[in-house]
């Protein structure tokens, strides 16, 4: 695979090869990714710390490597040599994967995780690929959505109780769950507590993806409602980038 990248009068070329017998979809995508990255860095003059990786879960690669019998060094080598991740970031990934595998050992047959989605946000960020809509445009759909969600939570809770499954983690994501008003959040958390047996739940997270949707009252509602963790996602610490997206 050969890539050519042009920008501001500069041109970068890069090629990567694999034996024909190894040219399956995964390996073909890999050399395309590598050749584009190497050509682009020649033109841009910068080296991203996450190398050629894209997406939101870089630890999938290191965790998969270790699950298949690779060592921590093997996982770091994969990230650094194949995807050009910096040593600092590869160590971060491998460390996260190590803790992931340790946490997985706590799971027992019949354990599961529950995700509750709130597909609404104050506004929609330009880069977002999640199923979500802004309250400004679709706020009228929020009350009926919550009514349906309450019914589904009650039904799912009964289903889990009858089948003998146990919730080990519960995550309320979105969208931006903290788009809900404090009364709406309180009612939703009450429905969760009434319907689910959380006695074996190790972590109950409410995602507060937009800090501007949080205040003291809502934080108290989340705490009193049984959540043990909140996830605040600044996306970036650069104010100009935040304003742009």
Feature annotation, model-predicted:
Residues 117-132:
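Local cysteine-cluster metal-coordination motifs and their immediate loop/turn environment
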């Amino acid at each position: 695979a050969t890539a050519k990248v042009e920008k501001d009068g500069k041109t970068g070329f890069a090629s990567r090869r694999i034996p024909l017998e190894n040219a399956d979809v995964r390996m073909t995508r890999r050399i395309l990714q590598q050749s584009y990255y190497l050509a682009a860095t020649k033109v841009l003059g910068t080296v991203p710390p996450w190398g050629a990786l894209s997406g939101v879960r870089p630890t999938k690669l290191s965790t998969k490597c270790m699950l298949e019998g690779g060592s921590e060094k093997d996982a770091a080598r994969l990230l650094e040599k194949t995807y050009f991740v910096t040593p600092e970031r590869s160590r971060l990934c491998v460390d996260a994967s190590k803790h992931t595998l340790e946490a997985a050992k706590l799971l027992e047959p019949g354990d599961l995780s529950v995700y509750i989605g709130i597909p609404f946000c104050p506004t929609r960020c330009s880069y977002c690929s999640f199923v979500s809509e802004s309250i400004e445009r679709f706020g009228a759909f929020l009350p009926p959505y919550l009514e349906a969600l309450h019914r589904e939570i009650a039904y799912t809770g009964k289903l889990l109780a009858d089948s003998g499954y146990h919730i080990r983690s519960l995550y309320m994501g979105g969208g931006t769950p903290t788009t809900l008003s404090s009364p709406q959040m309180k009612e939703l958390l009450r429905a969760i507590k009434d319907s689910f047996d959380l006695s074996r739940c190790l972590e109950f997270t409410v995602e507060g993806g937009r800090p501007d949707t949080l205040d003291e009252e809502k934080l108290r509602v989340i705490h009193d409602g049984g959540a043990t963790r909140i996830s605040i996602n600044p996306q970036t610490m650069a104010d100009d980038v935040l304003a742009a997206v």
